C-alpha cells in the first residue's frame, strides 16, 4: 500500500518559507488596525512580486497567503483579550469575513492534482494541511476560525486526489490522519478547541466509510455535550452523502443526527429537504423519517407539522396540536387549507380548545382573540353543513358568559350575536 499524501505534523519547509516571506512583505505596515484596508494593503504587498507559474503551487500559495493573513488578523485580539471570533471588533470581523470569502472562492476551483502529481506538489499540499491543522488546534485562537478550512481542503482538494487511488491506499491515508489527530489531543480544556478536535476526527472517520459511522457519530455526540456547541459547526456529512447518492446511509445519518440538531433550530428546513430526497429515492425509509422528526420535538415542531400535512396524516397532526397547546391563530388560513379541504371536522376541537384558552385570560384582549377564532369556527361549521350545531353552541356560549360585558360587546362587533 502507498501513502498518497504525506500526513505529518510538521509544516513543510516550502510552506514555512512562504510564511516567512509573507511576514517580511507586510512588515512596512507595522501594527496597524486589523481591518479590511489593512488586509487589502497586505495582500497587495505579497502579491506584487507575482505568483508562481505552476497552477498547483499558485493555488496553494494563494491559500497560504489568505490563511496567514487570517492568522495575523485574529491572533492579536485573541492573544491579548482571550476572546473568540464573536468578540472581534466590527472592522476586524469584516476583514475576517472577506478573507474567509476569498478562501471559499479558492476552494471552489479544483486543484489540478492527479495520481502522477509530483512529489513537490504533494509536499505543498501536505504542508498546507499541516499548517491548517496546527492553527485549528492552536490554543491561542478560536479553533473554528480554521476548522472550516480544514474541512474544505479535505473535501475540495485532498479527497478528489484520493479518488484516483485504490481503496487500500485511500484507507491508509485516512488512517494516518486519524492517528495524527489522536496524538494532537489538546491539553487545554477550552471547549471550542476540544470541539474542533472531536469534529475533525469525526469527519475523517466518516470519510473512511459506513463501517466507521458509529465511531464518527460518537465523536459528534461527545462534542454536542458542550454548552457552547452549535450544530451549524458540523461538517457537511449530509451534503456529502447526497452528492454520493448514498440514500440508505443518508437516512441513517439523518436519523442519528436528530438528537444533535434539536439543540438548535438552524438548518432544520434543509434537514427536512434532505429527508424529501431520501424518501423520493427510498420510499421504504419513511418510518425512519417519522422517528427522526419526533426526536426533533419540540424544537422541530413546525417541520413535523408540515410533514404531517404534506403526507396527509390529519389525525396525527391534530393530536400534536392539541397536546402541544398550539393556537390556530398562529397559522395562516392557507396553512390550514389542506386540513379544511380533506378533514375539516378535525379542526373543530383545535378551535374550541383555543377559544377556551383565550377566554381564561378574562380581559378584553383575550375576548377579542376568542371572537376572532369563533368567526373562523362559524365558517368551518358552515363548510361541514352543521350550522344548527353552531347556532346552538354560540347561543349557549353567549348565555353562559352573559355577565362578561366586554365579551358581549366583542361578540356583537363580530356579528356573532344580535
Language model regions located:
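Eukaryote-biased, non-catalytic alpha-solenoid scaffold regions
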Residues: 2-418
